[in-house]
């Protein structure tokens, strides 16, 4: 009698399928959780994004909510902001690169290459960023101005000259 293995292995075929799902949905991103429930103590998530997917800059204020991300394929821009939307740091991450974002740090992501896939780990349970955790200087997903906000994130992430000290200047700034 054959038994399904308990060990899961994910690779190129899985990344390709997840990226295809991301390309087919309006949000232009797709996640796949390895944890059993939203209440799990540790959240382990594969995320696939397309370049036209907008994620509002945000922070996770709960002290246990450090976030670690490993880019598996593609390229991601990562920006660190202060509460007014001034850029404090900028990173461009490629395959095999890891970013650790301490709890309380306002950060924004942007996808810089089609079919980008990354793996994220942080403490559970899941809590969608709300109120002060959502950057007041940037529109929420679905609000007017998100296309301009995404373009600004990409411009800051890919600027030839370091954008440190520049303001986000989105439609809500």
Region locations from a protein language model:
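Conserved short histidine dyad/triad with adjacent acidic residue
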Residues: 46-64
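Short acidic-glycine-tyrosine-enriched beta hairpin
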Residues: 82-104
